[in-house]
């Protein structure tokens, strides 16, 4: 008996990333319907979808209600917050396939402390010196150990705005302590880690829980305003060369990035007993 294919797709989220996903789905020659559960009205998405509804994308019950109403067979979750809230878990439980990891596996993206601890636990060669804090105890001694080469990162999701780098955002240990104290005041866990010097790039991989297919290497530009003079954002734009690499990378660099993503996916599978399904985001220097 041939399995009936359900080509009713749900895209969760309504930013530029989700617009690109909707456009890719829309270009498919297959007969399909595209639905979007959005946080705001995006006219580009509205032009491509059969329905766009504003709702609480972090609430599993709301998402499932929309899925059941429209007979969705596969959901693609763009933002990280719904993943952190367990929306993917809830969708799988209702029989809907999901591009996006379950809550435990998503910690590789939603918790910087978890990511560092995982790399350290599995001896993956991509981990600078770091410590995790939930109070000010030990903050100053560790800053003094690192000297002027440190980065302070809010542990959770902050839309690309939770990272403060010595020299760029923090001009002294006193300023670093003030930022750390602000995180403690909002009950936030944070990490302080060694500042790495070099060109940053990202390499993402599609994962079906069994293997990975790698995307081109890209360089992400996060700072707002002309001349990169503004604060960090979730991303102002990216670029990649025609050969799917970048001018400052060679084949060995790309292979190392591939291997780190593969090792990370394998570590997650070993730790939680199931594979990571979704887009694995690797950030490198």
Question: What is the meaning of each model-derived region?
Answer:
Residues 1-104:
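ATP-binding N-terminal substructure of ATP-dependent carboxylate-amine bond-forming enzymes
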Residues 11, 36-37, 76-77, 98-101, ...:
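General beta-strand structural signal in soluble alpha/beta enzymes
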């Amino acid at each position: 008996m041939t399995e009936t294919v359900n080509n009713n797709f749900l895209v969760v989220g309504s930013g530029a990333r989700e617009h690109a996903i909707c456009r890719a789905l829309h270009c498919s020659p297959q007969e399909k319907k595209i639905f979007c559960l959005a946080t705001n009205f995006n006219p580009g998405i509205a032009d491509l979808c059969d329905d766009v509804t504003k709702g609480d994308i972090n609430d599993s019950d709301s998402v499932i209600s929309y899925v059941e109403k429209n007979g969705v067979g596969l959901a693609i979750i763009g933002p990280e917050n719904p993943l952190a809230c367990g929306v993917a878990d809830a969708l799988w439980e209702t029989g809907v396939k999901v591009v996006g990891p379950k809550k435990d596996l998503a910690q590789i993206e939603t918790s910087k402390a978890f990511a560092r601890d995982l790399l350290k636990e599995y001896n993956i060669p991509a981990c600078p010196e770091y410590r995790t804090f939930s109070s000010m105890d030990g903050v100053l001694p560790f800053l003094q150990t690192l000297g002027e080469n440190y980065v302070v990162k809010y542990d959770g999701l902050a839309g690309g705005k939770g990272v403060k780098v010595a020299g760029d955002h923090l001009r002294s240990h006193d300023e670093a302590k003030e930022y750390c104290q602000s995180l403690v005041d909002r009950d936030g866990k944070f990490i302080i880690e060694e500042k790495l010097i070099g060109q940053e790039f990202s390499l993402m991989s599609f994962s079906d829980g069994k293997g990975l297919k790698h995307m081109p290497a890209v360089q992400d530009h996060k700072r707002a305003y002309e001349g990169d003079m503004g604060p960090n954002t979730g991303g102002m734009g990216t670029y990649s060369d025609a050969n799917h690499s970048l001018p400052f990378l060679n084949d060995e660099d790309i292979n190392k990035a591939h291997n780190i993503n593969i090792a990370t996916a394998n570590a997650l599978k070993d730790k939680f007993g199931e594979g990571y399904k979704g887009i694995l985001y690797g950030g490198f220097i």
